[in-house]
């Protein structure tokens, strides 16, 4: 019995350890090794830093990095404050049928990105039949080639992003709000604090762990965005590469051109960029600081 009690915890953890090794550690190590190789179906050849040196002068890769970082920053500006405000509003006493609203807000996240991307592509089509151009006609304006210019194309992309992920981030913030002790708000009421002061001095500081978590996953999600852009522009063929992302370029080199070694180098640079940005934001937000006793 004593022996089985000692072994049982390891048995329960074993499936997770195996899945971690098979689906995370092994692909990561393989990707690192392949980034130093020319890999094809016929075999592999060690080329050292060739792919990384080539990346330094690859204008398409630089465009993809710029687009991905810009997209990530814009989504942070949109998908942190807006879901937070919606969560506060949802938890307000003034809001009725809270469960219904939560379901409605979360439904877009359950929708296939392939379907939602196609719908947004039709909505923002350059023809007169596109819903957005029909709206422009009602306002007395001419049709706009939405997806052919960066500004209008990115408006469509960001709207698609907000439509899909606002509800998800809102639920994260709602879970954070539920963990705040209501006695703190009661104390603030006794001190005569208004709604704005309670949000600024009670809600916002105590939502810090949730906010840091949402920022962290949003950084990774923003930098790894691919399918939304791929579906909105019907493939990796956006005008002037306005929709080309790092993962989109990885897909183009690895899948479309069968240059897996170069694609792995792209993936490793993406990993380094994502880790660097998140380490900076975690340090800036004081995540690694020890709490004072």
Give the ranges of each region predicted by the language model.
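N-terminal hydrophobic targeting signals that begin at the initiator methionine
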Residues: 1-3
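A structural signal for multi-pass alpha-helical bundles of membrane permease subunits
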Residues: 5-293
């Amino acid at each position: 019995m004593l022996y089985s009690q000692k072994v049982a915890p390891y048995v329960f953890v074993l499936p997770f350890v195996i899945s971690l090794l098979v689906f995370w550690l092994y692909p990561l190590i393989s990707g690192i090794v392949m980034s130093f190789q020319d890999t094809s179906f016929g075999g592999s050849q060690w080329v050292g830093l060739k792919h990384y040196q080539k990346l330094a002068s690859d204008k398409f890769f630089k465009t993809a990095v710029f687009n991905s970082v810009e997209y990530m920053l814009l989504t942070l500006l949109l998908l942190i404050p807006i879901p937070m405000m919606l969560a506060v509003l949802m938890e307000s006493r003034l809001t009725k049928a809270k469960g219904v609203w939560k379901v409605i807000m979360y439904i877009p996240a359950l929708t296939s990105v392939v379907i939602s991307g196609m719908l947004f592509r039709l909505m923002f089509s350059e023809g007169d039949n596109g819903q957005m151009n029909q709206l422009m006609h009602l306002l007395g304006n001419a049709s706009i080639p939405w997806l052919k210019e960066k500004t209008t194309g990115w408006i469509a992309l960001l709207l698609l992003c907000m439509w899909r992920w606002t509800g998800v981030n809102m639920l994260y913030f709602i879970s954070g709000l539920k963990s705040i002790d209501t006695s703190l708000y009661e104390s603030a009421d006794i001190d005569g604090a208004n709604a704005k002061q309670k949000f600024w001095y009670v809600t916002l500081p105590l939502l810090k762990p949730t906010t840091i978590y949402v920022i962290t996953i949003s950084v990774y999600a923003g930098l790894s965005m691919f399918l939304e852009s791929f579906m909105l522009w019907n493939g990796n063929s956006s005008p002037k590469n306005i929709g080309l992302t790092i993962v989109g370029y990885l897909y183009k080199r690895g899948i479309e051109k069968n240059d897996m070694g170069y694609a792995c180098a792209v993936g490793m640079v993406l990993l380094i960029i994502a880790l660097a940005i998140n380490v900076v934001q975690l340090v800036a937000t004081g995540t690694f600081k020890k709490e004072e006793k």
